[in-house]
Amino acid sequence: MMAELKNKEHYRKILCLLIPLGGVAFLLWYIKNSTCDVVYSDYIRLVNSYLPDVYDPRRFFVPDVLTRIPINYLERIINVELFGFSITFDRVLGAVSLGLAAWAFGVYFIRRRLGTVWFLLTMAVMFSLNKWEMITNGSGWSHFFAFACFYYHELVFDRVWAGEEKRGDTLQLILLPFLIILGTAGPYCAIYAVVMILSAAAGILRARIRKEGSSARRYLVFLFSSLIPLLLYILSNSFAVEEHAGATGRSLGALLADAPSFPVRFILKSLAGMVIGGEELIQWIEKGQMTDNICYLLGLFVAAGYLWALWLYLRHRLYERTLFPLMLLTGGALNHVLIFLSRYIFEKENYALSSRYALQFQVGILGIILTFALVSKAKEKVYPAGRAFMALFCIAILLGNGYTTYREIKKAPYREERFEQMEQLAPLMPFLSDEEMMEMEPAVPDLYEYRKGTDQIRNAFRILEENGLNVFRKPAS
């Protein structure tokens, strides 16, 4: 009997480590079948800002360097020197980074001995193509890597919280926030830092209740280890010059005076986009196949999932054993608020459905699933209606994300076709006039998704041509 249990545990561990590999392989297949290796969108700005001399210290030692994500400088040097500034290389890094995040959850599932079915559901969310825009735009690779780092840091903290500390964990909890916030997190550091600060504050409170003075002092060190790099990032960010094309310029107060329900509608749509991809929801609404009110109801359903998970977490005192699910729930909820505060200036509630935010929003969904898994494993008493809601929520998330991924796979050839069009026209870009660019169908700024000046597009491709990079790179003989 014991041997059988050990074998079962062994196979479960293997699955928790191998399934993320399958997820990475799936993303690589998707990248291969939906993209081409051509500069576009934000890469045009990056080429004009940092190429051809990726070693130029003047491009690094700038007041707002932390907002530019320092790890990108190292990656850019490697990319230019070894791969000729390949966008595909960045996309692969993004897929691998998402795999690292999945492995972090695999470690948690192994440690907590949670069921494989729950892990499969978690992986379905993790590798869902509701993040297609981030996956295909390789410049976001560092964001995937940042979230893998967030999860790892939270797991180390959770280990200490649960009394399962390993050698070196204290040092990691002091150093990790500096490395993550100052090195790779960029604008995503705000919610991560707040979650870690709140977690450390919870540790201080618990230590004082238990009258453990040394433990309280240690958590205080953890708190300042997150606060100090956050303040440094905020200082660096104060020197950044931000452009918001399309912003109305109205203050939040003016917006609320005219449309007091706008924040609620925006956040409900951002929640709804975690069941079914935002692009699908927008298309349904535009075609009249779904009303805005149905979308809001879908958002309320997800909000109910948050509240039910939080209630279960507190009701069954899961915080005595693990803090990780609560960290995820808090981070997910705060991300919805943060996106509203940063995007209300456009006064378009459908902005909440952009796939570029799915990476942030899915944090909360993962927290909900983990909470349900922990309650289910512990065989805690839950009313039948509550269990039915848990089942309904998980089925909805699985089917919704599955449908979104299916639809995105169907769209992959059309996305690839658009990239191929960019690739074919790229050699012409350095020589086209503004009029010629605008006369094309679609116009060059629309095709390359860069609308900050045709001169910027022309100059970026001229730099690439002169230095034999990206589409102008000569094949190795």
Annotated model-derived regions:
Residues 3-76, 80-118, 164, 196-226, ...:
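Intrinsically disordered, polar/acidic, low-complexity terminal segments
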Residues 23, 119-126, 222-231, 317-345:
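Transmembrane alpha-helix segments characteristic
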Residues 27-30, 129-136, 181-184, 231-236, ...:
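Transmembrane-helix signature of polytopic, lipid-linked glycan biosynthesis machinery
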Residues 37, 89-93, 131-142, 353-357:
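Membrane-embedded glycan-lipid processing machinery
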Residues 109-129, 147-148:
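Transmembrane-helix signature of polytopic, membrane-embedded enzymes
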Residues 135, 142-146, 349-373:
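Hydrophobic/aromatic-rich transmembrane helices and adjacent perimembrane loops
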Residues 142-165, 197, 203, 364-367:
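Specific aromatic-rich, kink-prone transmembrane helix
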Residues 168-199:
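Membrane-interface alpha helices of multi-pass inner-membrane proteins
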